[in-house]
Amino acid sequence: MSRYTGSLWKVSRRLNYSVSETGKELRKRAYGPGQHGQKKLKLSDYGLQLQEKQKLRFTYGVSEKQFRKTFDNASKLKGIHGEMFLVLLESRLDNVVYRLGFAKTRAQARQLANHGHILVDGKKVDIASYRLKPGQTVTLREKSKNLNIVQEAVNSKFVRADYVSLDKELVGKYVRYPQRNEFLPDINEQLIVEYYNR
């Protein structure tokens, strides 16, 4: 299954959850899209698990195949499976680029990475799913700092996560792995674990 490229606003309304983390999608119409969008359906346990999985998958913008692979990799790590899964997703290069404020959305961050604008520890990395380790630096190539999407993002009001840092020269650092209470508070990862373990 390929990565979704349609309207994320429709997805957010269908899931009743802001996948962009801004909340803009639900301000005007806080109900599902389409003719029957305003009808409230009672979901089964499976439906709730699937919905939670889709919320997280669309938030990070990854394909089902990548999502499942990351979930399986998390099972090999020490710690609570669901939490380790979220930490692995947060450690993706495109997500850290977004958390640093180099891009306004994860989709923009993914594009910056895929097009070779990002340096990790001074070396070009063009794989958006590259997994960062604490202490690694993330910067933009010198000529990439003047890109419109970068300038707009850097100059916008942005609340940076505590587990990343950015200096005046736009040198970012993945300081440490995030604590569970520092990101995506509305996601119940246990439902996703139950979905894949059913």
Curated annotation (Swiss-Prot):
**InterPro entries attached here?**
Ribosomal_uS4, Ribosomal_uS4_bac-type, Ribosomal_uS4_N, S4_RNA-bd, S4_RNA-bd_sf
Q: TM spans, by residue? A: none
Q: Which GO terms describe its molecular function?
A: rRNA binding; structural constituent of ribosome
Concerning Gene3D superfamilies, the annotation shows: Ribosomal Protein S4 Delta 41, Chain A, domain 1, RNA-binding S4 domain
Q: Which Pfam families match?
A: Ribosomal_S4, S4
Residues in S4 RNA-binding domain copies? 91-154
Sorted UniProt keywords: Ribonucleoprotein, Ribosomal protein, RNA-binding, rRNA-binding
**What Gene Ontology terms for biological process does this UniProt record contain?**
ribosomal small subunit biogenesis; translation
Q: Which CDD domains match?
A: S4
Task: Mention any one GO cellular component term assigned to this protein in its UniProt record.
Answer: small ribosomal subunit
Q: Which family does it belong to?
A: Belongs to the universal ribosomal protein uS4 family.
Question: What subunit structure does UniProt give?
Answer: Part of the 30S ribosomal subunit. Contacts protein S5. The interaction surface between S4 and S5 is involved in control of translational fidelity.
Role noted for this protein: One of the primary rRNA binding proteins, it binds directly to 16S rRNA where it nucleates assembly of the body of the 30S subunit. With S5 and S12 plays an important role in translational accuracy.
Name assigned to this protein: Small ribosomal subunit protein uS4
